[in-house]
């Protein structure tokens, strides 16, 4: 069971308030997952967005609808990205440019994302192929690696050249409430979670 009694999940471009000032939105994804959960937190005269969805035409359109309708035409004040996966960071660059706001994320996630984007269009390195073969990958797995290598950046709008670094245990204000950063790894190298004790 979902812990919030919010009624039905939001449709594309819609939002559901799950806590005072915290809006739950869903952005479309292709494939089995179908959607990614993203968040908008009331922040003064605008919204702090947490995660953005992938860089696709459908996701961009869903955000345009959300900006106009669900978020009431208010500006985005900052974009917080929890980790480097394209379904979370894909439109961060687009959004920060559109609203002239800062990208906030952990250092390792930002730098690793930039590194992976730099490989876009390149062929799989022979060193990588040898490494994975020695690690026991079969020919199908190696071919999948070769075919998919260099595609990471295709789902990510160009990132800004600078960002505001998030650190584990750091606290800051969003919309008059104190939020704490809690980092972890496993799903990604330095994933950031946001925690607000008041909510």
Where are the language model's segments positioned?
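Divalent metal-coordination and catalytic microenvironments
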Residues: 21, 41, 51, 83, ...
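Metallo-beta-lactamase
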Residues: 47-57, 149-157, 161-164, 171-173, ...
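Active-site HxH/HxHxD metal-binding segment of metal-dependent hydrolases
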Residues: 58, 65-173
């Amino acid at each position: 069971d979902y812990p919030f009694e919010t009624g039905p999940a939001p449709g594309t471009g819609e939002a559901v308030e799950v806590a005072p000032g915290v809006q739950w939105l869903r952005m479309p994804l292709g494939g089995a997952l179908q959607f990614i959960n993203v968040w908008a937190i009331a922040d003064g005269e605008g919204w702090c967005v947490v995660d953005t969805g992938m860089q696709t035409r459908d996701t961009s359109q869903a955000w345009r609808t959300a900006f106009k309708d669900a978020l009431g035409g208010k500006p985005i004040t900052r974009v917080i990205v929890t980790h480097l996966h394209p379904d979370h960071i894909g439109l961060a660059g687009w959004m920060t440019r559109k609203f002239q706001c800062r990208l906030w994320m952990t250092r390792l996630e930002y730098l690793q994302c930039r590194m992976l984007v730099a490989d876009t269009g390149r062929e799989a390195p022979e060193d990588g192929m040898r490494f994975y073969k020695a690690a026991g990958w079969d020919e199908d797995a190696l071919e999948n690696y070769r075919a998919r290598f260099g595609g990471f950046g295709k789902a990510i709008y160009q990132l800004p050249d600078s960002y505001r670094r998030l650190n584990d245990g750091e606290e800051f204000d969003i919309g008059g409430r104190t939020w704490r950063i809690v980092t972890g790894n496993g799903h990604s190298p330095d994933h950031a979670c946001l925690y607000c004790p008041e909510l």
